[in-house]
Amino acid sequence: MTRTRTVKKEKISVASEIDRVEERKLQCKNSLERAEFRKRKQQLSDDDRLALEDEMTILNERVEKYEKDLQVLRGENRRNMMLSVALLAISALFYYTFIY
């Protein structure tokens, strides 16, 4: 099962993976904002307040995790772009050296 999941994950482009992670991060931030708004505006019992704070802690951890994932993905995207530029430069060099 993990093999098929890995194969599917490899077929996804880095740019689409970045978009997906950014969307999830945005959803978590929106949920966090709603939770903070509820905490400020509503009179909550101690149990509800603790549950809300736990939820906010979990959401903050998820946002941090997504930010780390984005940082890694952007680095990978940057590396892929540099590799593409290098291949283009080498191709142009060979073209002008041997064909032109």
From Swiss-Prot:
It is a single-pass membrane protein. GO terms for cellular component: membrane. Keywords: Coiled coil, Membrane, Transmembrane, Transmembrane helix. Signal peptide: none annotated. Residues 14-81 form a coiled coil. It is found in: Membrane. InterPro entries: CCDC-167. The chain crosses the membrane at residues 82-99. Pfam families: CCDC-167. This is Coiled-coil domain-containing protein 167. The gene is ccdc167.
